[in-house]
Amino acid sequence: AAAAHVSYRPGLRHAISKGAPGIALLAGEPPQPGERPEVTFARSVGWATSIGEVIQGFRAVAAPVVDSAGVCRAAVAVVFAGSSDVSGVADFVVAHAKALGSDL
């Protein structure tokens, strides 16, 4: 049995400013006045992280997928339970986001 079960009903949404995937998407865009500090930080390091912003007890790490024209098209994310070190996960999502972006 799984330690946790996560599912979304079709049509369920949350604000783009919540959670690592949304933060990564915003970080892939030019800076905006009044943006969350997490977006500014994600833009500087190339990835975003969040803990419990969308689902309590879950952490996410995400990176923007930027195409060859420099346009952010998507985000790659890994969501997991717990609060383990994210550096290895961050390296993974950044590498895969770059690989996807180079194919666009």
Regions found by a protein language model. Give the residues of each.
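Cytosolic beta-strand hydrophobic patch enriched in CBS
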Residues: 48-50, 63-65
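Short Gly/Pro-enriched turn/cap motifs at secondary-structure boundaries
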Residues: 14-16, 50-53
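Flexible loop/coil segments at beta-strand boundaries within sensory signal-transduction domains
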Residues: 66-72
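Juxtadomain coupling helices with adjacent low-complexity linkers
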Residues: 32-40, 45-48, 54-56, 72-104
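Amphipathic alpha-helical effector-binding/dimerization core
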Residues: 1-31
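Conserved catalytic motifs of the protein kinase core domain
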Residues: 21, 58, 71
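Residues in well-ordered beta-strands of folded domains
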Residues: 26, 61, 79
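A short beta-strand signature within small-molecule sensing/ligand-binding domains used
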Residues: 56-64
